[in-house]
Each structure stands twice: as C-alpha cells, then as structure tokens.
Curated annotation (Swiss-Prot):
Protein name: Exodeoxyribonuclease 7 large subunit
Gene Ontology CC entries for this record: cytoplasm; exodeoxyribonuclease VII complex
Locations listed in the record: Cytoplasm
This protein's encoding gene: xseA
Molecular-function GO terms, alphabetical: exodeoxyribonuclease VII activity; nucleic acid binding
One GO-annotated biological process of the protein: DNA catabolic process
Domain of life: Bacteria
Length: 451
C-alpha cells in the first residue's frame, strides 16, 4: 500500500498549532502595507480590521495598549504599514496579524532617510559636545524662529515676559510644517545668524504627529542650525519627541516653554543676588573700618619714650593711614563699579536700585568723614602724650638749672660723701658738659680716680 495511508494523522488543532508555530518563528519583524477596510472599534478600545491590496486581504487585530500609542485614530481607507505577530487564530483556523505598531504608508522610507542622515551627521561630529556653544547668562536680545500662528510662540513670549520683561524679543516667522517648510525654516535661521541681532536663538514649534514634526529632521534645517553663529536652543514638540534638530542644537529643551526658561534669567534670582552683594559690601566696609580702628589703638599703645621712636611711630601711623585710606577708597571704587554694573543690568527695576545707590553714596560720604575725625582724634592724643614725655625728659630738667654729675666710670654721683680729693668728675649741663676735679679731700682716695 502507498505511504500515504501509513503517514501520521494530525488533528485539526494540531495542524493549526503547527502552522501557527511556523508563521510566528519565520515571519517575525516584517512590515506589511495595505489599505484599512472593515474597520471596527470595540467598546474595550480594541481595533479589528482587514488590511487589503488589489489582490488579497488579511485580518488584523490591534489591542487597546497598542491602539493608545496611535498618533491619530484609524479610519476606513487609511493606507498604512503595520508590524506585529503574524499567526493563526487556532480556534477558527483564521490567518491574522496581531498589530503592535502602525505608521502611515511611506514613513518607512522617511525613517531610512532619517537614519542615514543621522549616521552621516554623527560621523561628521555635528552632535559632538565640544562644538556646542554655551548659552549667554544674560542675553541682551532673544530670537525666536517659529510660525506666527503657533501656540508655541504665545507660550514662549508669555514665559519670557514673566521672567525677563526687559529683554527684547525678535521673531523670525516661518511655516513649521507642510511642503517646503524645511527650506523656509532654514532660511529664517540663516537670517538670524547673518543679522546677529540676538545673543541666543530659540527654534521651536508645538507638539504634533511625526509627519508634523518632520521638517525638523530635514537636512536644510539641520545644516542651518549647525552653521548658525548664534547659540541655538531647540524646543520642538513634547518632551518625548526627538528630531535631528534637537541633536545638532547647542541645547535641547523638552518644550518651547522649557526653551524660554533656559535662555532667560530669573528676575527674582537677580534681585536676590543684588541684595546679597549689597550685604557683602556693607559687611566688608564695616569690618575694614573696625580692623583699622583696632590697629590704630594697638599702634598708640606701642609708643615709647625716646623721641626717635615717637617720630618713627608718627611716620608709620601717617603711612598706615594713607595706605588704609587708599585701600578703602580702592575697595569702595571696585564695589561701587560692580554695583553700578549690576544696576545697569537691572534697569527695569531702577526704583529699587536707586535706593541701593543712594545708600552707597551716603556710605561713601560718611565713611571718609568718620575716618578723618578718628584720625584727627588719634593725632591729638599722640601730640598730648608727646608733650607729656617732653615735660619729664632729662633734657627738660637740665634746662631748669639742674646738672648731672658722673664719675669716670659713668656712675651718677647722688651723694657728696662719696667724693674724694682729686677725683675726676664729668658734669652735664643743659647747654654743654665739662670735666672737673675735686679740690677738697673727703674720705679714702680711690685708686681709679688718681690715674
């Protein structure tokens, strides 16, 4: 008999399971293109439809989780490309695709072009961190490249007005989607770069489908951002949207509003830093004044009797006073210049800065006067102490008619009983000195005095 009658017999369920295994193991990773027909959306959120072309069709099921990722709902007649698990529904033996991903027909070629351009730019170093330009801390002007009708423009302008209303904004209008929009976006970026009116440039638009954002993946836009001499912040779409413009820009912001926050200084933070600078200036000036006062007190306590030491101390105090005055003036000028620079940077808040400026002027006026008064007082005190020392000095006593008598060894003679006849003496007067000899002997003669 034929082998046909002796071959293994499969049940229907075994056949379907075998076919399912073959399909799932050998047809993975395929994209299938076709037109949506017989579309049904269940209350559960699942999609059931057929994908057809001119000669055949296949049943498809797309469950709620995958359907939630669609940029927009499916509709009858859509030309799409799907990827998923190709299998057999064993219960009914029906061939079907369980869809995991959907894209509009033709996006496959776009993604291929996207990956090619991305790889090329990567190889050229367009994404390298070292070519990124830093953002200015306090821009004098901010540029925006977007559509005048875009909600993103309103969001950016509102944020800039709230955070830094004193900074002017220039808009370089351009369509941000549609045929030819990539060329117009690129031209707007080139215009901003050539005019050099702004310190930083925001390139932005609101969220949308991948097709809506595709202009920012086109090479003209990417090359324009790469060549721009002004730092560029990209704020395209939502936080989960990534375009080639994001990779080549100097900074990527998650949203247009985020881009506005990145480029604008915070007004409250600036005012806080100004208040801190004023406090530090006051503390430094007070500390220098106290240090100078203590040093003058210490110098006054170091004054000793010799006239030469007094003269040296006078000269030292004068020099220290000049140095201290010069140092304080220099520091005051430096802090004043810094304060004026910060005042100019915050001209929008001139009333508050004016109060601070008046305080600085008051301190500039009061401090030299106080220092001069203190220095005058110290000089008067020094003069009085010098006069007191002068009054009790030996020279002054001699001028009153006294004299100093010393023996040949330089010992002062305080008692006449120690004198001996013929002893040599040295007498110092106010206006001179002389040597004498004792003519009348008293007591034992000293051998040393007879030489």
């Amino acid at each position: 008999m034929s082998d046909f009658f002796h071959s293994d017999v499969l049940s229907v369920s075994e056949l379907n399971a075998f076919a399912k295994s073959i399909l799932e193991n050998h047809l993975a990773g395929l994209w299938i293109a076709g037109e949506v027909s017989n579309l049904t959306r269940a209350a559960s959120g699942h999609y059931y439809f057929s994908l057809k072309d001119s000669r055949a069709q296949v049943r498809c099921a797309m469950f709620k989780g995958a359907a939630a990722r669609l940029a927009k709902p499916l509709k009858e007649g859509d030309h799409i490309e799907v990827a998923g698990k190709i299998s057999i529904y064993e219960t009914r033996g029906e061939f079907q695709i369980t869809v995991n991903e959907v894209r509009l027909k033709g996006l496959g070629q776009l993604y291929e072009a996207y990956e090619r351009l991305k790889a090329q730019l990567q190889a050229e170093g367009a994404f390298a961190a070292e070519r990124k330009k830093p953002l200015p801390a306090r821009p004098q002007c901010i540029g925006i490249v977007t559509s005048l009708a875009a909600a993103a423009l309103r969001d950016v302008v509102t944020t800039l007005k709230r955070r830094a209303p004193e900074i002017p904004v220039i808009v370089y209008p351009t369509p941000v989607q549609g045929t030819g929009s990539e060329l117009q976006i690129a031209q707007a970026i080139k215009t901003a770069s050539q005019r050099a009116e702004c310190d930083v440039l925001i390139v932005c638009r609101g969220g949308g489908s991948i097709e809506d954002l595709w202009a920012f993946n086109e090479e003209p836009v990417v090359r324009a951002i790469e060549a721009c001499t002004v730092p560029v912040v990209s704020g395209v779409g939502h936080e989960t949207d990534f375009t080639l413009a994001d990779f080549v820009a100097d900074v990527r912001a998650p949203t247009p509003t985020g881009a506005a926050e990145l480029v604008s200084p915070n007004r409250q933070e600036s005012l806080h830093r100004l208040a801190q600078a004023q406090g530090r200036l006051k503390t430094v000036l007070e500390q220098r004044y106290f240090d100078a006062s203590q040093k003058l007190d210490w110098l006054a306590r170091q004054i000793r009797h010799p006239r030469q030491k007094l003269d040296e101390q006078r000269a030292s105090i004068g020099k220290l006073a000049q140095t201290l005055s010069y140092s304080m003036k220099q520091n005051l000028r430096a802090h004043t210049a810094r304060f004026e620079r910060q005042t100019q940077a915050l001209q929008h808040y001139r009333p508050d800065v004016s109060v601070c400026k008046n305080n600085i002027v008051r301190l500039q006026t009061a401090l030299p006067a106080a220092f001069s008064q203190l220095l005058t007082h110290r000089r008067q005190s020094l003069t009085a102490q010098a006069a007191l020392l002068e009054a009790v000095s030996p020279q002054h006593i001699l001028e009153r008619g006294f004299s100093v008598v010393k023996d040949t060894r330089g010992q002062v003679i305080r008692n006449a009983d120690v004198l001996k006849q013929g002893q040599k003496l040295h007498i110092t007067f106010a206006d001179g000195e002389t040597d004498v000899r004792v003519s009348k002997e008293q007591g034992q003669q000293d051998l040393f005095d007879c030489i």
